[in-house]
Amino acid sequence: MAYAIIETGGKQVRVEPGRFYDIELLSVEPDEKVTIDSVLLVQNDGEVTIGQPLVAGATVQGTVLRHLRGRKVLVYKMKPKKKTRKKRGHRQEITRLLIDSITLNGTVLTAPTATEETADATPDTETAAE
């Protein structure tokens, strides 16, 4: 299974092809393609490529699924014996991003197809009977 570690929105995220992730808001419309060049690490079939600080020639392609707001974070400030209370809430704007592929030096590492996933998930009848 191939994966990459990317930097977006001041955070580092471990991404795999075929999965979606909630990241900081991107100024891109839904259903548009996004290419992320800030790739810190790429792993494919046990071979790890680490950047210093970025991996040269590595990109991650994704599709923006939708924009949404995160859970509300409440901040409550109180000073005892003064009757001073402040309650504030904040909801972060986030983007749901589906990772299509990881590219390393022109080699595209894509998500496994549905037939491969179901073949791996079904147990072998010969080994299960023994």
Curated annotation (Swiss-Prot):
One Pfam family, please name it. Answer: Ribosomal_L21p
InterPro entries xref list:
bL21-like (IPR028909), bL21-like_sf (IPR036164), Ribosomal_bL21 (IPR001787), Ribosomal_bL21_CS (IPR018258)
* A GO CC annotation given for this chain: ribonucleoprotein complex
Q: Does the keyword GTP-binding apply?
A: no
Q: Where does the signal peptide begin and end? A: none
- According to the record, the residues making up region (Disordered) are 110-130
Q: Does the keyword Ribosomal protein apply?
A: yes
Enumerate the Gene Ontology biological process terms.
translation
**Record-level Gene Ontology MF annotations:** rRNA binding; structural constituent of ribosome
Keywords, A to Z, come to: Ribonucleoprotein, Ribosomal protein, RNA-binding, rRNA-binding
Family recorded in the similarity comment: Belongs to the bacterial ribosomal protein bL21 family.
- Classification via NCBIfam families: L21 (TIGR00061)
> Can you state the subunit structure given in the record?
Part of the 50S ribosomal subunit. Contacts protein L20.
Role, per record: This protein binds to 23S rRNA in the presence of protein L20.
Protein name (record): Large ribosomal subunit protein bL21
